[in-house]
């Protein structure tokens, strides 16, 4: 699993690390993985994660228990990322679906994020841009 910290602020930031108990958002691609880092979540923070588990260990916990734990964090969401990515035109767009779902709690306007997505994927062609934007919008609607 990969973990990254991202801090956004209008003022100077003395460290790029997020202290435990202070994260406004934990964004994840796998439900059990986000729970491993839930101690970083602020009391009013939310978890947004892809719903689909990546079961790569023989003793993976019962999935409903994981869903229940994620849902115990107020405002948190399990996103049907694979189905939405397929609806967008490419099953590999799950990350963009999850980012779209997070857009409602990020301090950045969705239109700003969409402009960045368009710029980032422009070199890959209009079809790739369109699929990523559709995946983002589908996630945003969830």
Regions found by a protein language model. Name each.
Residues 1-142:
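Active-site cofactor/cluster-binding pocket
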